[in-house]
């Protein structure tokens, strides 16, 4: 069955006939979607590149904002709005930046990435929690790519290694409604964990070479 609703609140880069800066749904419709989903115990994620759609989604009480690229009429990452940020913070909305490992080629040579990093810093200072994600399914981004994406995400978002790890585990589990059963190693939880030949709190690159994977306490993959 369905356990989460995702709405394309704005246009996308690979969606024919759409523009990332244009809102596809107004706040009233998004609020109706959120209210209906909540009646069925479901969370709602909203694809939002532009500030107009981010504002509508935040006002509607969306659970997670995917991308949150702050696209304005002046360009990508140039539509940052402190009032919209305050709304995101007030609503307790999680932000999922969808930074994959391919972004590594932009680090240090992209005004957009520099602007975006500054925006994420402002968001974190305001108390917004960022969760690790990759937008898997788009061209050249596979569903198992998070381990190589996490160091890139940490660099762009200004996260320490331990903060990046939380964004992919305990924080992420909480954001998608699994905080009571997964995302941590503790009594009563699902016992999903990975062993590495190294300390990922010191070096996130070790995530790309797991030694052993356990699911619900049982080994499922050996290197």
Regions found by a protein language model. Give the residues of each.
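Residues embedded in well-ordered beta-strands within globular domains across many folds
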Residues: 6, 66-69, 165, 195, ...
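Active-site core of metal-dependent hydrolases
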Residues: 8-118, 126, 131, 137-138, ...
């Amino acid at each position: 069955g369905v356990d989460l609703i995702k709405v394309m609140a704005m246009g996308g880069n690979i969606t024919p006939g759409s523009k990332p800066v244009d809102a596809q749904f107004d706040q009233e419709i998004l609020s109706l979607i959120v209210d209906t989903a909540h009646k069925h115990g479901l969370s709602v994620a909203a694809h939002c590149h532009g500030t107009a759609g981010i504002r509508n989604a935040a006002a509607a009480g969306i659970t997670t904002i995917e991308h949150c690229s702050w696209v304005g009429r002046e360009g990508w990452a140039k539509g940052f709005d402190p009032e919209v940020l305050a709304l995101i913070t007030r609503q307790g909305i999680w932000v999922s930046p969808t930074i994959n490992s391919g972004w590594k080629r932009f680090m240090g040579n992209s005004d957009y990435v520099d602007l975006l990093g500054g925006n994420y810093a402002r968001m974190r200072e305001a108390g917004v929690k960022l969760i690790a994600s990759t937008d898997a399914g788009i061209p050249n981004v596979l569903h198992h790519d998070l381990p190589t994406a996490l160091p890139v995400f940490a660099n762009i978002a200004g996260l320490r290694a331990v903060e990046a790890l939380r964004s992919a585990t305990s924080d992420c589990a909480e954001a998608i409604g699994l905080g009571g059963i997964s995302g941590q190693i503790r009594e009563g939880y699902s016992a999903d964990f990975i062993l590495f030949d190294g300390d990922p709190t010191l070096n996130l690159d070790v995530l790309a070479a797991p030694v052993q994977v356990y699911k619900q306490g049982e080994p499922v993959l050996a290197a």
